[in-house]
Design a protein with these regions (language model features):
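Solvent-exposed beta-strand sheet faces enriched in polar/charged residues
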Residues: 6, 36, 45, 78-80
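Short glycine-/aliphatic-rich beta-strand segments at the starts of folded cytosolic domains
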Residues: 1-11, 40-43
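Positively charged, solvent-exposed patches that mediate nucleic-acid binding
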Residues: 43, 47-49
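N-terminal glycine-rich anion-binding loops that anchor highly charged ligand groups
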Residues: 31-37
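Short amphipathic alpha-helix segments
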Residues: 12-28
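Short, conserved charged micro-motifs
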Residues: 14-16, 50-57
């Protein structure tokens, strides 16, 4: 089963890369774009033989302990159907 882990900076953390992209977007004439935040995207495959609750726990732990810096980042897990 495939899980997508999306990691972003917490809203209270300054995102200098997002700010730079936002400035470029404005100077290039893209109307209505008011904010850009940069993040990371991970695809994680867990064996279908692993029980569903265990799969969720594995990916959650992986996201918390390996894929993110919990001080400045947050994450969301999306499971593929």
């Amino acid at each position: 089963m495939k899980a997508t882990v999306i990691v972003t900076l917490k809203p209270t953390v300054l995102d200098p890369q997002g700010i730079t992209i936002q400035r470029s977007v404005q100077s290039m004439g893209f109307p209505g774009v008011t904010d850009v935040r940069q993040g990371k995207y991970f695809e994680v495959n867990v064996s279908d033989n692993t029980p569903a609750e265990q799969r969720k726990g594995i990916v959650d732990r992986l996201a918390r302990e390996v894929l993110t810096n919990p001080v400045i980042e947050q994450y969301k897990v999306v499971w593929e159907q």
